[in-house]
Curated annotation (Swiss-Prot):
NAD(+) binds at residue 15. It catalyses: a quinone + NADH + H(+) = a quinol + NAD(+); a quinone + NADPH + H(+) = a quinol + NADP(+). Residues 7-194 form the Flavodoxin-like domain. Coiled coil: none annotated. Keywords: Flavoprotein, FMN, NAD, NADP, Nucleotide-binding, Oxidoreductase. This is NAD(P)H dehydrogenase (quinone).
């Protein structure tokens, strides 16, 4: 197969932390030669007034994706906040609409990867690993963030998100903590790694 490697960074963000990580992931993927990257979000199911009352980020510039388009990409990198150790309802609703893709095997052999954010660390890893189950059912090739790629994973000099499962950030109980440069670096490296693997599988 020829042509550019197409990577979709698909996310849901409540307070902007995942949106920030998603942009870093997309930047990393775009750093790989021959890669075309799109940044999109899943539809928001929460009413705008309820979001505003909760202090959530209502306006986000990324266009909204449709479940049907996932098969158009060589890799999809999913980003979701944590809700009780799992993905958000918005992301769940989106994935629940991919049954038609599953029936056709449209995602078999595509690369899938996940990044997340948590308030204080609870569910940081379970959100990613439980998300992987969905990717396995679709026959996707699951890619994480190896220590050999994300060398910041060895650094314990400060509190940070990120693991071999994928990039992440700790937002804090009040959501005021923003992704650090180390967390953003890991996100970029995850994007680059996924794009590299997808290109090799496409070749």
């Amino acid at each position: 197969m020829t042509g550019k490697t197409k990577v979709l960074v698909l996310y849901h963000s409540s307070y902007g932390h995942i949106e920030t990580l998603a942009k870093a992931v997309a930047e990393g993927a775009a750093s790989q030669a021959g890669t075309e990257v799109l940044l999109k979000r899943v539809p928001e199911t929460m009413p705008a007034d309820a979001m505003a009352n909760a202090g959530m980020k209502v306006e986000q510039e990324a266009p909204v994706a449709t479940p049907q388009e996932l098969g158009d990409y060589d890799a999809v990198i999913f980003g979701t906040p944590t809700r009780f150790g799992n993905m958000t309802g918005q992301m769940r609703t989106f994935l629940d609409q991919t049954g038609g893709l599953w029936a056709k095997g449209a995602l078999v052999g595509k690369v899938g990867s996940v990044f997340t954010s948590t308030g204080t660390g609870g569910g940081n890893e379970t959100t990613i690993t439980s998300f992987h189950t969905n990717l396995f059912h679709h026959g996707m090739v699951v890619v994480g963030l190896p220590y050999s790629v994300g060398t910041e994973l060895f650094d314990i000099s400060e509190v940070r998100g990120g693991s071999p499962y994928g990039a992440s950030t700790l937002a804090g109980g009040d959501g005021k903590r923003q992704p650090t440069e180390k967390e953003l670096s890991l996100a970029r490296k995850q994007g680059a790694h996924v794009a590299s693997i997808a290109a090799k599988l496409k070749a």
